[in-house]
């Protein structure tokens, strides 16, 4: 169309969880203007938590301002990831990264909803999140909320092609820096 606005919507992020009655799934809505996200909303249904942000504003959770974690120590950081559904040619590198983070971070979680993972980074529940094999509808809203909450978001090369590039690293500054270093090395970026 001639519009400079584009909606990126995932009506149910975490579909497999929903089907199997695992209570982690969310609705993710982003609005892009001139190829830039200007509004992001992630609603985690079972917790009745609405994470949102807008350009020039703040990142919020149910009406209260949120920020990424201030944890400076990567060894004390709680990370999140998702498991790839395709592109298994990169699986060895993914498992090497997973192993490294298991040995050097406080723990790794897999919720099954990238939008919820990103929302949790934005409010400080997780220090970082990484995954590949993603779609724009999985990450556009959540990544924007992380950025507006003071976090860093890039692709595996440290560049800004994370919405349409199928791979993403998000976190507070110390966690993002360490994850980017390890991931770019293991994935030969």
Q: Can you name each region flagged by the protein language model?
A:
Residues 119-122, 143-148:
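Hydrophobic residues within well-ordered alpha-helices
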Residues 29-118, 165-189:
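Acidic beta-strand-loop-alpha-helix segment within the catalytic core
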Residues 123-128, 151-152:
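Alpha-to-beta junction loops
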Residues 1-5, 74, 122-125, 163-165:
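A short, glycine/Asx- and small/polar-enriched loop/turn
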Residues 15, 44, 146:
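Conserved G/P- and acidic residue-centered "switch" motifs that form tight phosphate/ATP-binding loops
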Residues 1-12, 152, 160, 174-189:
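N-terminal subdomain of lithium-sensitive/metallo-dependent phosphomonoesterases centered on the IMPase/IPPase/PAP
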Residues 131:
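Short beta-strand and adjacent tight-turn residues that come in two discontinuous sequence segments
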Residues 1-33, 41:
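Flexible, acidic active-site loops/lids enriched in D/E/S/T/G that coordinate Mg2+ and/or position polar
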């Amino acid at each position: 169309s001639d519009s400079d606005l584009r909606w990126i919507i995932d009506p149910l992020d975490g579909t497999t969880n929903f089907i199997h009655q695992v209570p982690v799934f969310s609705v993710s809505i982003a609005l892009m203007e001139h190829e830039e996200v200007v509004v992001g909303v992630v609603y985690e249904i079972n917790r009745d938590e609405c994470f949102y942000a807008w350009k020039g504003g703040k990142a919020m959770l149910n009406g209260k301002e949120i920020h990424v974690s201030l944890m400076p120590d990567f060894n004390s950081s709680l990370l999140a990831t998702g498991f790839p559904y395709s592109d298994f040619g990169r699986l060895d590198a993914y498992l090497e990264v997973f192993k490294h983070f298991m040995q050097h971070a406080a723990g790794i979680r897999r919720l099954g909803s990238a939008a919820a993972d990103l929302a949790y980074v934005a409010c400080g529940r997780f220090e970082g999140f990484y995954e590949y094999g993603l779609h724009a509808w999985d990450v556009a809203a959540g990544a924007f909320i992380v950025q507006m909450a003071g976090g860093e978001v890039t692709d595996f090369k440290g560049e800004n092609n994370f919405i349409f590039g199928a791979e993403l690293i998000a976190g507070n500054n110390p966690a993002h820096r360490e994850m980017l270093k390890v991931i770019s090395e293991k994935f030969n970026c």
